[in-house]
Amino acid sequence: MFKVRVIPCLDVKDGRVVKGINFVDLRDAGDPVEAAIAYDAAGADELTFLDITATHENRGIMLDVVRRTAEACFMPLTVGGGVRTVDDIKTLLRSGADKVSINSAAVARREFVKEAAEKFGEQCIVVAIDAKRVPGKDRWEIFTHGGRKGTGIDAIDYAQEVVSLGAGEILLTSMDRDGTRQGFDIPLTSAIADSVPVPVIASGGVGNLDHLVEGIAKGHATAVLAASIFHFGEFTIRQAKEHMVRSGLPMRLDP
């Protein structure tokens, strides 16, 4: 069985972490590279950077962040946000990203997923899905543009389609749960994870360590992504992993 992964996520705007980080030993809580180094030392399996910079002109700042992080850290790095072209992917991979996450651009043009997977390999193409339950129904709709724009597209159908086109992994965020600290949307997570043959990363709603276990055991995800429970020093990566091991999940634990 694959080892379950624990993945912290950093939102970066204009080269700075925006949600804030409260690590004890960080000299500069707003510097994403400092935060990445701390997570690497703490035993994170991977790290996800989400570039929420509004302007394309500041893209160079993010590339510098990726470069400096890749030089300083051993863990795999996924970068997403504003990825619209094959050239965007190439530049990020050359800067040191191991995987690139695409979201709105894949919804707008599905062929983009196929082109990216054929050029760079399925293993480094992640499709990020932001989904929200359709009121009164047992189905979920895809949203784009940072969750602001509904599409009417069914989340399960879309997940299956992008995987058939070459997505090697799905990063699934429940918009209903994001920021609530009430736990993952288990029906959504399991519905997607059970419908595709690639790894699914559960995201949105983690408030305690049991939620991480539930994402895997009940949601059938292969990895869990969280932000605030780690950023603010509430729990360490090691505490999360040890709790998951005690729950019977296969984890990579550094000595």
Curated annotation (Swiss-Prot):
EC number: 4.3.2.10
Coiled coil spans: none
GO CC entries: cytoplasm
Pfam families tied to this protein: His_biosynth
InterPro entries for this protein: Aldolase_TIM, His_biosynth, HisF, IGPS_HisA/HisF, RibuloseP-bd_barrel
GO process terms (BP): L-histidine biosynthetic process
UniProtKB keywords: Amino-acid biosynthesis, Cytoplasm, Histidine biosynthesis, Lyase
Assembly and oligomerization: Heterodimer of HisH and HisF.
PANTHER family: IMIDAZOLE GLYCEROL PHOSPHATE SYNTHASE HISHF, IMIDAZOLE GLYCEROL PHOSPHATE SYNTHASE SUBUNIT HISF/H IGP SYNTHASE SUBUNIT HISF/H
Family as reported in the entry's similarity comment: Belongs to the HisA/HisF family.
Name of the molecule in the record: Imidazole glycerol phosphate synthase subunit HisF
